[in-house]
Amino acid sequence: WVIGKADSTKSKTRKTKPIWAGIELGVNSYLDNKGDFNLADGKENFELKLNKSVSFSLNFLQKNVQLGHSNVWFFTGLGVTWNNYRFDDDIKLSNGNFTNAYHDTTAGVSHQKSKLVASYLTAPIMFEFFTSRKYKNAFHMGVGGTVGLLIGSHTKNKVEIDGETKKLKDFGDFNLNPFRYGFRVAMGYGRLNVFADYYASTLFKDKKGPVLYPVNVGITLVGL
C-alpha cells in the first residue's frame, strides 16, 4: 500500500452484508392461544388500533460472519426496541397479581386514549442469503430469530377529569415477560429490507395475564 495510490485489493463496488444496524419501523399486533387476531374469551378489551400500534427500533451494533466464500452470512447484534400497543377501547391496565384491561368508572373521569409501551434490548440470531455480492442488484432473504430483555414498560392514558384533559403515565412491569424469544424472516433488494417477527413467548407471564403472542412486521429504513 502506497500513499496516494488506490488499494487494488479493495473492490470499487460495496459488497453485500446483512442488514440489521440502522432504524426499523413496524406495526405491532398479537395472536391469541388459538392463533386468531380477533380476540375473544374475555380478551376483547385488549384489541388494538393497528395504525397506532407502532414499533421503533434503533439497532446500534452488528457482527457479520461470512460462511466461507459463499453468499451466506451469519449475523448477530444489539438494538433497542420500543413496542407501542394502542388499545382500540379506552381502558386501563391493572398492575397487580394478574394483568387485566378494564373500564374506569370513576365519576368525573372520561378516558380518551390508552396504550402500553414496552421496551426491550434485542439481539438477532440470523442467517442471510444473497443472490449477488453487490448491493445494487442483490436480492436477499434471512431466517432465524431474535431474543429480547425487557428494560422498561409503562402505560399512558389520555383522560378528561372534571373537564380538564390530562396525560397520565403509570410505570410498572404489568406482569410482562422479562425475556422474549421468537422467529424472524426478512427479505429485500439492495438496501431495502422488510421483516416479520413472531414471538413464541407470550407477552405476559404465565398465568399472570391473557395468553397473547406478539407479532411485528415492518421495514428497515436505514442499513448502516
PLM feature spans:
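N-terminal targeting leaders of membrane proteins
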Residues: 1-28
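Predominantly the C-terminal beta-signal and adjacent terminal strand-loop region
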Residues: 171-224
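Residues on the lipid-exposed face of transmembrane beta-strands in outer-membrane beta-barrel proteins
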Residues: 23, 27, 56-64, 78-80, ...
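Residues that define the transmembrane beta-barrel architecture of outer-membrane proteins
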Residues: 17-19, 50-56, 117-121, 137, ...
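Glycine- and aromatic-enriched membrane insertion/assembly motifs of diderm outer-membrane
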Residues: 17-19, 27-32, 38-97
